[in-house]
Amino acid sequence: MRLDDFHYDLPKRLIAQRPSEPRDSSRMLLLERSSGEWQDSTFSALPDLLRGDELLVVNNTRVIPARLFGHRVGVRAQNPGKSPKTRREHLSSPIEVMLTRRLSENEWEALVRPGRKLPTGERIVFGEGELEAEVLDRAEFGVRRLRFHGAAPLEQSLERLGHIPLPPYIAREDDPADHERYQTIFAHEPGAVAAPTAGLHFTPEIVARLRARGVEIVEITLAVGLGTFQPIHSEEIEGHVMHAESYEISEVTARAVEKAKRERRPILAAGTTVVRALEDAARKSAAHAGPQVAVSATRGASAQLSARIEPGRAEANLFLYPGQPFLIVDQLLTNFHLPSSTLLILVSAFAGRENLLRAYAHAVEANYRFYSYGDCMLIR
């Protein structure tokens, strides 16, 4: 399929620059996969729109202050006798670093700008010299591998020096409010460089109402990284290669998913990150088990390749596009995504491309708010 098949026009005025207040006041577009019909609603109505026996899977990753501003270290700046203030005067050109994936305690993959002339061995200083990064090598997709050095643990330095990595279509700098609002209420596992935005609409009150209705809620962890916002450069989408993202599925969650599948209870994924983790784990489990069983890929029901989910840590570079089966997920809660993006293509694979683009056209006409801080869809 061609990338142009997933384009739509969006007025800039509909790109949300701030979140809705309160969280659950966001609008929600309900889309039925089987018929393509839609209905306008609000997120606060979610508990009333569900059957009550769903398994809701959420992403508990926490966004870190992954955006850093520093300077390249000049030759004169390498004199260890210089004070931080004097040393700052000898730093050369400014550098912006966007962390994308943690490799170890002090090593990260990162996007660096400008990075074209940043060779291996180059050093970058942040703040008054309390944090440094050394360029180890180039990784895939044009990112650099960095090793950080500092007197304090890296997490503490990031909290002090880093900025919340708001997406580029939010045309402002981050502020103190974003440190709370660009996190979901489920967030407790640090490591993401973007929020799992479908989770931003939940409140403790909504969670309590869902549980009172009989909805079971479990968690996965997927540290959102470069794979989420990496653009597609090939005209044919099948040629795109996703950047790997780490995820973890607990024993409790794996068994809950398997039990729900056996009992034919709907599995509702809160966001595309949950979809990628569950669907990748199902494929890995099926491959480990041997020959695949027959796949039923009827529209409106999940394909039953494998109801087995292996718990543990893994990496996913799964790219879901139309024609591929969904093995686990039955329903999807998701925000509105950028044109021609991997996320829009994933949702098109789940909902049907024509269904989704018609629903998006309605959302534009009805002035829904788009992207990370915008409104959402419930697709079932």
Please report, for each region that a protein language model flagged, where it lies by residue:
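Surface-exposed, charge/polar-rich loops and edge strands
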Residues: 1-288, 293-380
